[in-house]
Amino acid sequence: MGTRKKVQAFVRVRPTDDFAHEMIKYGEDNKSIDIHLKKDTRRGVVNNQQTDWSFKLDGVLHNASQDLVYETVAKDAVSQALDGYNGTIMCYGQTGAGKTYTMTGATENYKHRGILPRALQQVFRMIEERPTHAITVRVSYLEIYNENLFDLLSTLPYVGPSVTPMTIVENPQGIFIKGLSVHLTSQEEDAFSLLFEGETNRIIASHTMNKNSSRSHCIFTIYMEAHSRTLSDEKYITSKINLVDLAGSERLSKTGSEGRVLKEATYINKSLSFLEQAIIALGDQNRDHVPFRQSKLTHALKDSLGGNCNMVLVTNIYGEAAQLDETLSSLRFASRMKLVTTEPAINEKYDAERMVKNLEKELALLKQELAIHDSLSNRTLVNYDPMDEIQIAEINSQVRRYLEGTLDEIDIINLRQIQEVFNQFRVVLSQQEQEVESALRRKYTLIDKNDFAAISAVQKVGLMDIEGNLVGEPDGQSFGLGVAPFSVKPGKKPKTKKTPKDQFSSSARKEGASSPVSGKDFDVASISKTQLIPSSKDGDLKDMLARERETSSIEPLISDSPKEELRAPRPSTPPSRTVAFEEFKNERGSEINRIFKENKSILNERKKRASETTQRINAIKQEIDETKDALNFQKSLREKQGEYENKGLMIIDEEEFLLILKLKDLKKQYRNEYQELRDLRAEIQYCQRLVDQCRHRLLMEFDIWYNESFMIPEDVQVALKLGSSIRPGMVPISRIVCLGEDDQDRFSHLQQTVLPEGLDSITFYNAKVKTDQKHNYMKTMVGLQQSHRK
């Protein structure tokens, strides 16, 4: 592309039964809108009120379907993104004018999906059509609410909570949101799941203009990286598509917003005002400065407004006479956006690994050409590889003979040999300087003229060796450790460089220690693997691994025991979850609960040992400091007395010698205790992870047991044998998911089954159903944990 182009601006009119035909007229080419207002007679005879406006656009979408909107607005920008061009699609307009519907659409109906899900679908369809390229797709979802940044995908299980607030960072590659999670997606369904997850976390509120009004700006970004599968070229292309759903502007005097809605509207209007200022500055060719940093919105979109990307604006307006003032304001913004010019360019980068391989091939080819050139010049046995130690020693010998005069000249072979000759000249010169200095030191005592302390010491005691030869030199300073309360629980698990297998090995060497049995990974499906088995005093790693294999071979904990068959019948009314949880821990979950308690007791024992070790370390540190003070006192006392042997060496007494030995032993104890503390901390982190996983398993098993025991539909109960118990696996998971479903849920299942839209809608509906099921499960778990705390 490479040429400058204008930003494309489209207008979409919200359908209404009360369309102002007399005031709003469309051009014949469907690329202009004319607005006509009647003069207000209340202003008198002299009335200079403007009554006519005309706006030139790239297209007017009136009564247009979602398919037509996407084909007109976004399809070209998305297809060019796979060729390496960045793209930005933005929806702007009044509150309730249809921005979110245009961008996201209705997630309940496949036909009514918006630009965003259609763009995801097009990306993965085009990837399938390009088998010669390996294309990686990542997505992120950013929300800007009241000038604060939020990650809409931070609620996913594998995304940890952010410790520091999110910030906008600029680097040579563009704008980077520090703290924003970016998720790899290899399938269309995974991308839809992330979209629905973010939509669930968006902030919406009821408004006079819209019952479900978006109260924040949202930016969904699709990152793409394409490598060639056939070519060995180190060059590859990257691109990103920013899909921006802006919050709606409003006139506070007309909407009458109050309280929190008023505060939100103030922030929204302020950020949109700064956005318009940035657009005006970009459209003015004489402006050198563009105020991007005035708001989080403009700063986050700095590399997406103009620049080297394809930009498309969709302005959503009302067609009613009552909203004509806001419609004019939105159309002015669209006309100003059309003044902004962009210069799209392909984003090319270079793969360092492939570049190294290509350079190695080129180097080998150049060596072959050089060998041919040497053979044609009758030069044989010329080596251009890096020199080894033997060749360097030979050059060093030639340099020495040249300096001594026994060698007249040094033959020049190649550039590498010339560089090494100069290097050996430097080495020989340095060695000669050291030899001269050593000879002077043997004959004279060298003292720095600026070292007044050394001069005074020599004058005082008459020593030739100003440094002296003392027994036991002081080493580096150590540090102390604070003792944390035993009951304190860390808010976040610290990172450790040790793997679980390393932690197990280190703890197995401790005498009398109880170590967690660990395989390659902790298997949540087999809860028996999470049990912490104490090891014998002289046990080794092989015995522990044998125990682990025996433990892992145990059948699942839930068995068809006679006790379950003889249980009392369940009451007709389901008990509360708190009572049912206690019953579950005594019956079905007794084994899981026992393992959980054992793991927790071993974790507490490790924490107690760590606290005791910390106290011992602090005591040893205090004793080391006291011993150092005593040793320094003895040294100063000895230096004052000035006791020396005939050779000029200082003499230390027995008391000072014992202090030196004691200090050495204390430091050894300190190192051993500190190493033990590090091992204990690693074990504590590993045990804490096992306890958390065991707790999660216990709650998950309880939820399944509760639904199977008290929430089974009547037709499933009739199908079961009389008096038999309900075990996991007897009830299909689809029936468990449907427990307590209402008419809307049944309609959703029917909608997914029938799929009138065709096979392309399968991934869309699957992602929607999975996201809804996950959020329902999370709500159930939160309610259960709250009732358990009470």
From Swiss-Prot:
Keyword Cytoplasm among record annotations: yes
UniProt KW keywords: ATP-binding, Cell projection, Cilium, Coiled coil, Cytoplasm, Cytoskeleton, Flagellum, Microtubule, Motor protein, Nucleotide-binding, Phosphoprotein
Every Kinesin motor domain range: 6-340
Ranges for region Disordered: 482-521, 547-577
Xref: CDD domains: KISc_KIF9_like
Residues with the Phosphothreonine modification: T530
GO cellular component, one term: vesicle
Gene3D superfamilies the UniProt entry points to: Kinesin motor domain (3.40.850.10)
Any GO BP annotation: microtubule-based movement
Gene disruption: observed consequences: Mice exhibit impaired sperm motility and male subfertility and flagella show an asymmetric waveform pattern, which leads to a circular motion of spermatozoa.
One family name in Pfam for this protein: Kinesin
Residue ranges that the Swiss-Prot or TrEMBL entry lists as coiled coil: 342-442, 600-695
Tissue: Highly expressed in the testis (at protein level). Weakly expressed in the brain, thymus, lung and heart.
Recorded family membership: Belongs to the TRAFAC class myosin-kinesin ATPase superfamily. Kinesin family.
Subunit description: Interacts with HYDIN.
PANTHER family xrefs: CENTROMERE PROTEIN E, KINESIN FAMILY MEMBER 5A
Function comment: Essential for normal male fertility and for progressive motility of spermatozoa.
Record protein name field: Kinesin-like protein KIF9
